[in-house]
């Protein structure tokens, strides 16, 4: 049975697999494209499974953002070569869009979401592994929503909305949304650069905080200072520690004469509250 070249082309477009695989699948399925798609998906999954024990340590972070909802995802591959591939970039952007559209709050939710013409997102990722020849892995997802305010974000990279590190922030205010977005983007850029560990002092891990204070107290004790003086030194060093790891206490990257909290207060928009943030670093901890 002679295969229609248009059918072969359509099959390649739908599956991303090679010419010979598509032609063979159509021949075995008597020209039925739907059956051939199912057969090729099985082939693609089998090829992807062979790569499952390989390490995917490169990749991209992608962001999808609207006024009151934002999502960041990380899709990993094995090499920078594939990370710059158009098919990989298209897949990452599609996954971010699906995560945003479906309001996915976890990696598992996104993996089980529908991916048009293929099945699920996880099947699309496995298909990508087969097409690109490297293990692909959806490793992280950050989701933020703001009911009374805006979500702003920033991804540092060469392509709009794609890069190696990104941040989302939630700002609450009844004020001008466009101005809030601009304030939020500047803070998101600060977060990407300074990588804070917590929003406020109260949000710090208490065990880590206790350990840090114990170390500082031990250091100060060796100075043999009077108790009052020693306490002031400890408090001063703790304040310095907060400046390093707490977002609201950090010196604002665009003007180190003020803290991030001061920048928010000085904005033209009234009653602004930074209620939450997310930072996603390629290959970093969740």
From Swiss-Prot:
<comment type="similarity">
    <text>Belongs to the EF-Ts family.</text>
</comment>
<dbReference type="GO" id="GO:0005737">
    <property type="term" value="C:cytoplasm"/>
</dbReference>
<keyword id="KW-0963">Cytoplasm</keyword>
<feature type="region of interest" description="Involved in Mg(2+) ion dislocation from EF-Tu">
    <location>
        <begin position="79"/>
        <end position="82"/>
    </location>
</feature>
<dbReference type="InterPro" id="IPR014039">
    <property type="entry name" value="Transl_elong_EFTs/EF1B_dimer"/>
</dbReference>
<comment type="function">
    <text>Associates with the EF-Tu.GDP complex and induces the exchange of GDP to GTP. It remains bound to the aminoacyl-tRNA.EF-Tu.GTP complex up to the GTP hydrolysis stage on the ribosome.</text>
</comment>
<dbReference type="GO" id="GO:0003746">
    <property type="term" value="F:translation elongation factor activity"/>
</dbReference>
<dbReference type="InterPro" id="IPR036402">
    <property type="entry name" value="EF-Ts_dimer_sf"/>
</dbReference>
<dbReference type="InterPro" id="IPR009060">
    <property type="entry name" value="UBA-like_sf"/>
</dbReference>
<dbReference type="InterPro" id="IPR018101">
    <property type="entry name" value="Transl_elong_Ts_CS"/>
</dbReference>
<dbReference type="Pfam" id="PF00889">
    <property type="entry name" value="EF_TS"/>
</dbReference>
<dbReference type="InterPro" id="IPR001816">
    <property type="entry name" value="Transl_elong_EFTs/EF1B"/>
</dbReference>
<keyword id="KW-0251">Elongation factor</keyword>
<protein>
    <recommendedName>
        <fullName>Elongation factor Ts</fullName>
    </recommendedName>
</protein>
<keyword id="KW-0648">Protein biosynthesis</keyword>
């Amino acid at each position: 049975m002679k295969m229609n070249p248009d059918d072969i082309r359509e099959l390649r477009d739908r599956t991303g697999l090679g010419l010979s695989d598509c032609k063979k699948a159509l021949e075995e399925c008597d020209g039925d494209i739907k059956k051939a798609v199912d057969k090729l998906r099985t082939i693609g999954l089998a090829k992807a499974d062979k790569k499952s024990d390989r390490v995917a340590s490169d990749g991209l972070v992608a962001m999808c953002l609207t006024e009151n909802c934002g999502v960041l995802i990380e899709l990993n591959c094995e090499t920078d070569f594939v990370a710059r591939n158009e098919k990989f970039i298209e897949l990452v952007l599609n996954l971010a869009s699906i995560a945003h559209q479906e309001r996915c709050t976890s990696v598992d939710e996104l993996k089980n979401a529908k991916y048009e013409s293929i099945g699920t997102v996880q099947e699309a990722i496995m298909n990508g592994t087969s097409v690109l020849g490297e293990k692909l892995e959806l490793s992280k997802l950050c989701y933020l929503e703001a009911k009374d305010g805006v979500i702003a974000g920033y991804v540092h990279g060469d392509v709009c909305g794609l890069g190696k590190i990104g941040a989302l922030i939630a700002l609450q205010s009844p004020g001008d949304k466009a101005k809030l977005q601009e304030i939020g983007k500047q803070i998101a850029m600060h977060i990407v650069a300074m990588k804070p560990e917590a929003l406020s002092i109260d949000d710090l891990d208490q065990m880590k905080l206790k350990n840090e204070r114990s170390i500082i107290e031990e250091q100060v004790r060796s100075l043999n200072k009077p108790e009052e003086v020693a306490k002031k030194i400890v408090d001063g060093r703790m304040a310095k520690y907060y400046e390093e790891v707490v977002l609201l206490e950090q010196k604002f990257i665009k003007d180190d004469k003020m803290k991030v909290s001061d920048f928010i207060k000085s904005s033209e928009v009234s009653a602004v509250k930074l209620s939450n943030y997310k930072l996603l670093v390629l290959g970093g901890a969740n």
